[in-house]
């Protein structure tokens, strides 16, 4: 599970060069810092031995912000939320005339932002199948079966795989695998064609053609 702490404290005043989405990789404590319109959200993995009340306590909150900015007791939070992370894919994205898209069809950890984006791609793909059916230009059965096959395949081959890889990477910290991936990313950065292909895949544009 993740603990999400929301605060109006301007973290950028304490941590230079923050982006709107920041993944902090550390073997002792990894976390995510997200900027939303009026708040910063701090997402941290939780200790499974602690109760919900303990995880949402001032003690936990203070410790997290002590390590982030110092003087955690003075940091006010607007929300303290616990939520469970799943890696699941429905056996079928279709049940008769009912079609599943987004979180109804698949769940994954939030590292990389693939959940919402893949849901948008589901809807886009389904629209492409439904429009000709509704206009009488295509048969419903093969069209909906194709949607199910295409989107489940992409979910398994990319979204699930990539989010699991992201989780392993951020949890690993500065180990050998981390250094190897950093070296690989530098190679990608320095090659125009490789960089474009990588960005197309990460932006999930490649999956639209599958």
Q: Which residues make up each language-model segment?
A:
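Detector for Asparagine
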Residues: 17, 22, 62, 108-109, ...
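Conserved FAD-binding catalytic core of PHBH/FMO-like flavoproteins
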Residues: 1-85
């Amino acid at each position: 599970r993740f603990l999400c702490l929301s605060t109006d404290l301007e973290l950028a005043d304490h941590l230079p060069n923050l982006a709107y989405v920041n993944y902090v990789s550390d073997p002792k404590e990894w976390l995510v810092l997200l900027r939303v319109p009026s708040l910063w959200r701090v997402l941290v993995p939780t200790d499974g031995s602690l109760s919900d009340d303990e995880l949402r306590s001032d003690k936990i909150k203070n410790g997290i912000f002590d390590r982030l900015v110092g003087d955690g007791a003075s940091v006010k939070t607007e929300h303290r939320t616990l939520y469970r992370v799943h890696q699941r894919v429905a056996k079928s994205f279709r049940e008769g005339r009912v079609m599943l898209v987004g979180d109804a069809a698949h769940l994954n950890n939030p590292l990389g932002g693939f959940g919402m984006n893949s849901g948008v791609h589901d809807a886009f793909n389904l629209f492409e199948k439904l429009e000709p059916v509704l206009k009488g230009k295509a048969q419903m059965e093969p069209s909906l079966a194709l949607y199910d096959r295409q989107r489940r395949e992409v979910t398994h081959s990319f979204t699930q795989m990539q989010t699991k890889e992201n989780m392993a990477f951020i949890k690993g910290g500065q180990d050998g695998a981390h250094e190897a991936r950093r070296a690989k990313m530098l190679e990608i950065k320095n090659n125009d064609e490789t960089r474009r292909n990588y960005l197309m895949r990460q932006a999930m544009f490649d999956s639209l053609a599958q």
